[in-house]
Curated annotation (Swiss-Prot):
GO biological process: pyridoxine biosynthetic process
Protein name: Pyridoxine/pyridoxamine 5'-phosphate oxidase
Residue numbers binding FMN: 60-65, 75-76, 81-82, 104, 139-140, 184, 194
Pfam families per record: PNP_phzG_C (PF10590), PNPOx_N (PF01243)
Quaternary state and interactors: Homodimer.
Enzyme type, top EC level: oxidoreductase
Function: Catalyzes the oxidation of either pyridoxine 5'-phosphate (PNP) or pyridoxamine 5'-phosphate (PMP) into pyridoxal 5'-phosphate (PLP).
NCBIfam families: pdxH, PRK05679.1
Residues reported in the UniProt entry to bind substrate: R7, R8, D9, Y10, K65, Y122, R126, S130, R190, L191, H192
Length: 211
């Protein structure tokens, strides 16, 4: 397979300094809204990157579940590889690849655990099947066969057939406190537009970066 000639032009539009609000979350909200309106597949899907104790990076796709000026939120099994890595190294990066809109957003920050109340509010809002799945899977542990996982799910489905399902102690969320957020818009002749918001005490410094 020849990869050298796989490329395309970027022509959907540019991004100017005058277009940028002082708060980066406002621009992110606009771009996410436009991604949803464009009917992109999984517009809230983001790549979450963490590192282990040896500095080895790991990435996976996770769904964004909430965001505001205080940070970006996702949920996971607290025994998962990403959660265990965040216990040791709280630095994290997020990446939203909205290719059809010729846009990317890259976020760096620090992860902190959500409160038990925040976890409960989201967990109880999930479909019952998703709640049971959270109990059934010991995320990132080794499995002998898929049948073992499916059997555990069916066992728990019967156990929790009636009444509310409690929040597992090994399940919860993280809020990513933003250190920086970069907005990338594809441009003509590979002259892409990149703007970096960097946290400067209680304000944001905005810089244009070379593509």
């Amino acid at each position: 397979m020849e990869l050298e000639d796989i490329r395309r032009d970027y022509s959907l539009g540019g991004l100017r300094r005058a277009d940028l609000p002082q708060e980066p979350v406002e621009l992110f909200e606009l771009w996410l809204k436009q991604a949803v309106e464009a009917k992109l597949t999984d517009p809230t899907a983001m790549t979450v990157a963490t590192v282990d104790e040896n500095g080895q990076p790991f990435q996976r796709i996770v769904l964004l579940k909430h965001f505001d000026k205080t940070g970006f939120v996702f949920y996971t099994n607290l025994g998962s590889r990403k959660a265990q890595q965040l216990e040791q190294h709280s630095k994290i990066s997020l990446h939203f690849p909205w290719h059809p809109l010729e846009r990317q957003v890259h976020i760096t920050g620090t992860a902190e655990k959500l409160t038990a109340l925040e976890n409960m509010k989201y967990f109880t809002s999930r479909p019952k099947e998703s709640q049971i799945a959270a109990w059934a899977s010991k995320q990132s542990s080794r499995l002998t066969a898929r049948a073992a996982l499916e059997g555990k799910y069916l066992e728990l489905k019967q156990k929790f057939a009636k009444g509310e399902i409690p929040v597992p102690k090994f399940w919860g969320g993280f809020r990513i406190k933003i250190d920086s957020i970069e907005f990338w818009q594809g441009g003509d002749h590979r002259l892409h537009d990149r703007f970096l918001y960097s946290k400067d005490q209680n304000d944001w410094q905005i810089d244009r970066l070379a593509p």
